[in-house]
Amino acid sequence: FSELNNLENISMFDQYSAICGISMTELTSVMKPDVEGLGDALGLTYDECLEELRLYYDGYHFSKHSEDVFNPFSLIRAMNGQAIESYWFGSGTPSYLIKSLQKYHVNVMDIETKGVTIDDFDVSPEQMTSALPLLYQSGYLTIKAYKPLTKSYQLGYPNNEVRIGMLRSLAPNYLSPVSIDNNGLVTEFVDFLYDENIEGAMNRLKAYLSSISNRLSNKNERDFQTVFYLIFNLMGAFIKVEEESAIGRADAVLQLPNTIYVFELKYDGSAEDALRQIDDKGYLIPYTASGKKLVKVGVNYDSDQRTIGEWIIRKG
């Protein structure tokens, strides 16, 4: 068995990076009829269906210069089921993953990381000193960028299926322990936004936070930020939730077909201060040429009441 000492780990080699997935080239050639059939079933054009599949199942990179690959399990399930759903998480989120995140005190906002070395995530389980190797090797995180100068990697969620599935799995630890309550808040909030009833959305959010106020007791500002991070990012299953831009970002930017909502949140501050920060930091600038209505929402969280104290809504 001396040969076993000479095994070579090829998992980070560019030439093998697409061996376990389906590439865009394969999807648009060999599987093109399947994409067309799925698009017909969903009332989407070929290009629209391709984009939905990309957002939900693409995005895996397993080396420095890897091409994008799709999750084959979910992609094939989508073709067979004629629906774009979260199939991978339907198979169950391992309890040991959640326990590992708790063991290593991983905050949900810090799961996506920048500036890590290969030794931080491409190691065997017995050498783990953080949850990063487990998250990467089990497919919850993937390589998003590589910087040759520092030989560092940026890791992040590969796609919407994984991001939303992970956040839904973690939500009961921070929000209501009853998943249906959390999902109900998110879908109702989004419905209010589509109806352009931002007052209704904020009142619904305030009532929800009041209903879980016992879970918000003895929480600090960081915990408050985590709660809002989860709520707004869970909306990414239904609407576009913006990521950080070159000039920074507001706490939440939600894009609908005709309107863009920019939220800034304060903890024991004032809603006016929140609006002022949106203007001072230029959070609206990236969206001024979008042709959509811009709406600013300044929100203040009252730690004594353990819910939203006030909010102010203004057109951009």
Give the location of each predicted region:
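Mg2+/Mn2+-dependent nuclease catalytic core
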Residues: 267-284
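Conserved catalytic cores of phosphodiester-cleaving nucleases, focusing on short active-site segments
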Residues: 228, 250-267, 281
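Domain-level recognition of nuclease-like catalytic cores that cleave nucleotide substrates
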Residues: 286, 292-316
